[in-house]
Amino acid sequence: MLAKVERIDPSELELNDKLIFINRVTKVVKGGKRMGFAALVVTGDGKNHVGIGVGKAKEVPSAISKASANAKRNLSRILLNGTTVPHEIVFKYGAAQVLLKPAAPGTGIIAGGSVRAVLESTGIKDVLTKSMGCSNKANVAKATLGGLTAMRDPKATVTKRRSSLKEEATGG
């Protein structure tokens, strides 16, 4: 599942919303069919902050505004290494699996659909991606966000491992 992160105040950031998809849904009731809409929105400031939100309503504009408000409530801070991700990672959400690989400067975002929208909102400029498993846009977007939040600083990991090895060697 997605990792727990600290709360980020959206009022301090200049956020831009991107609509990933709108889905028309129908509920069959005794009197006929009731139409509704579901929207998936990604919001980010292009400087390491990104969030995903889903909104449902009877009309499209209200579904989009609900999704945008939900995305602002679910903001995450992402660790970057310059314009790319610090290391390769494969993250799974439901049946959707997303591979994120660092790329050389000037490569661009090699991604499609909801993966591209999430990465552009984050501010990542160079990355290689592969989406595997299901093609459900919501699950692919959540897998991408999960992979980004699971990123760790390689230098911090090395120092943490070294300190734990020293403690083990000294018998502490």
UniProtKB/Swiss-Prot annotation:
SUPFAM superfamilies: dsRNA-binding domain-like, Ribosomal protein S5 domain 2-like. Part of the 30S ribosomal subunit. Contacts proteins S4 and S8. The N-terminal domain interacts with the head of the 30S subunit; the C-terminal domain interacts with the body and contacts protein S4. The interaction surface between S4 and S5 is involved in control of translational fidelity. With S4 and S12 plays an important role in translational accuracy. It comes from Dehalococcoides mccartyi (strain CBDB1). This is Small ribosomal subunit protein uS5. Residues 15-78 form the S5 DRBM domain. GO terms for cellular component: cytosolic small ribosomal subunit. Signal peptide: none annotated. GO terms for biological process: translation. Keywords: Ribonucleoprotein, Ribosomal protein, RNA-binding, rRNA-binding. Belongs to the universal ribosomal protein uS5 family. One of its GO terms (molecular function) is rRNA binding. InterPro entries: Ribosomal_Su5_D2-typ_SF (IPR020568), Ribosomal_uS5 (IPR000851), Ribosomal_uS5_bac-type (IPR005712), Ribosomal_uS5_C (IPR005324), Ribosomal_uS5_N (IPR013810), Ribsml_uS5_D2-typ_fold_subgr (IPR014721).
